[in-house]
Structure formats: structure tokens, C-alpha cells
Design a protein with these regions (language model features):
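A conserved hydrophobic helix/loop-capping motif in glycosyltransferases and polysaccharide synthases
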Residues: 3-8
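Histidine-anchored nucleotide/phosphate-binding helix
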Residues: 12-26
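Short internal beta-strands
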Residues: 31-39
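Short, charged/polar "capping" segments at the starts of alpha-helices
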Residues: 39-46
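Active-site-proximal specificity loops/subdomain of glycosyltransferases
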Residues: 50-95
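Short aromatic/hydrophobic "clamp" motif used to bind/position activated sugar donors
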Residues: 104
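Catalytic metal- and UDP-sugar-binding loop of GT-A-like glycosyltransferases, i.e.
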Residues: 107
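Conserved donor-nucleotide/metal-binding helix-loop-beta segment in metal-dependent transferases, i.e.
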Residues: 111-123
Length: 123
């Protein structure tokens, strides 16, 4: 299962709790976490990698800091001041993630998972 989060440094702690809650209730599932990263530090990335790998799962980071400027250049009149890039990135994840990723479940960083997500993912 491919799970996507969009986060900045300030939400890493919340995202970590969400990731652990998801793993704890889906231990038998093959999980790959795709993190759309708006300036998450290398130190935080390393901590998250160690945590996720400790459970035998995968995690990949995709820097998205450049997206806002690209959007302004591509969409005339786009008022990007009203949205954070982590909000817009979830709409563009199809062009950010590798082509081999054909299905994902997007979760907000403050989501706590209390049971298996397999039925939801299989919809």
C-alpha cells in the first residue's frame, strides 16, 4: 500500500504519530510512505527513516519547496497566497510521485489510524 503525507517541519511530530498508528494497525501489510516534504530537515528525515525502517516498512521523501514558483509560472492568475504548498501538493501528487505508483491513500498528518486500512485501500 502506498500512503502519502504532505508535511513541513512543524508537522513532522504529528505525522510520525499518524505513521506509527497506521503501522501498528496494519503490521502485515506492505507499506510505502511517500512524504511530500516542504522543508523537512535532513535530521527529521533521518529520524523518520529510522522509525519506519524499524518496522520493516519503506519511506521516500519528495521535496516540494519549488512547486509554488512552478505553479505561478504555469497557471496565470493563480492566487497561491491563500494556500500552503502542502495543501496544493496533494492535488499534484500524480505528477510528483513515480509513474509506477498507480494507487495511493492520502492521509493528513493529524490522522490517527485505529484499525486496518486494507478495506479502504482496496475500494
Amino acid at each position: 500500500m502506498n500512503i502519502v503525507y504532505a508535511s513541513d517541519e512543524g508537522y513532522c511530530q504529528h505525522m510520525a504519530v499518524s505513521i506509527v498508528s497506521l503501522i501498528e494497525h496494519n503490521k502485515s501489510e506492505q507499506l510505502t510512505f511517500h512524504i511530500l516534504s516542504d522543508g523537512i530537515s535532513i535530521e527529521k528525515e533521518d529520524q523518520l527513516r529510522a522509525m519506519v525502517r524499524g518496522y520493516g516498512k519503506k519511506i521516500v521523501f519528495y521535496p516540494i519547496e519549488h512547486l509554488m514558483e512552478e505553479l505561478r509560472g504555469q497557471i496565470y492568475g493563480l492566487d497561491t497566497g491563500r494556500f500552503r504548498i502542502t495543501t496544493l501538493a496533494r492535488l499534484l501528487m500524480g505528477s510528483i510521485l513515480p509513474r509506477m505508483v498507480t494507487k495511493v491513500l492520502y492521509l493528513d498528518c493529524d490522522t490517527v489510524v485505529l484499525r486496518s486500512i486494507a478495506p479502504l485501500y482496496r475500494l
